[in-house]
Regions:
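C-terminal lid/capping helical subdomain adjacent to the catalytic/cofactor pocket in oxidative enzymes
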Residues: 118-207
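Active-site substrate-recognition segment that forms the wall
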Residues: 1-122, 181-192, 197-203, 207
Length: 207
């Protein structure tokens, strides 16, 4: 169903030993997402596991087969990441402690897919997260619980419908043509079932 819409991509992360470790403690160094001439990078303070951890979104833009993807990190991977650290975080650019590969699974617009199956509306799914799903795990879990229990959710997930990537007319969706959340306690109809939601405070989009 997601063939061609969920594209696996090889990623590489580095852990470097800071030469100025006092600058990379969690109380002084933030989680960052940095867009620079070389691309978009993300990283974290030293926490739990030793080392300044960071990577580059889309790394070398290598589309891979998950069954045969290169799981080794190479000298050219290390050079790309160290060049970034030397320029922007020189105090974090000590010896390389570790390099690890992983995969992002990206949609064409880099957004999530959260919806009901177009042919089997009793099935809900959440994939892929395009490399930025972890920080939304709690609310995605809430959305998926809503969909599993009622087929709709109080969160506005219209941005993440499957049909934005496929054909606009062939599915029941988690976001039909009425609000997914009632603020006045009125009922809405979906699939011959009445759904009623009590008044709740306005919910801001989670993305």
């Amino acid at each position: 169903m997601l063939d061609g819409l969920a594209v696996p991509e090889r990623q590489v992360l580095a852990w470097l030993q800071p030469t100025r470790p006092e600058h990379f403690r969690p109380d002084v160094f933030p989680v960052f997402n940095l867009l620079v001439d070389e691309g978009r990078f993300y990283g974290f303070p030293v926490f739990g596991v030793p080392g300044f951890k960071f990577g580059k979104y889309h790394h070398l833009e290598e589309i891979v087969d998950p069954e045969t993807a290169d799981r080794e990190a190479h000298d050219y991977d290390e050079k790309l990441l160290r060049d970034f650290a030397e320029r922007y975080f020189p105090g974090g650019c000590g010896p390389t402690m570790d390099l690890q590969t992983c995969m992002f699974t990206n949609t064409p617009d880099n957004h999530f897919v959260l919806d009901l199956h177009p042919d089997y509306p009793q099935v809900s799914f959440a994939s892929p997260c395009s490399g930025h799903g972890y920080k939304f795990a709690s609310v995605i879990g809430e959305v998926m619980a809503d969909l599993a229990e009622t087929g709709i959710t109080r969160h506005d997930i219209s941005l993440f419908r499957l049909d934005r990537l496929t054909q606009p007319s062939r599915r029941p969706s988690a976001m039909p043509d009425f609000p997914a959340r009632s603020t006045d306690g009125e009922a809405y109809e979906q699939n011959s079932h009445s759904r009623s939601f009590p008044r709740v405070p306005d919910v801001r989009p989670f993305w």
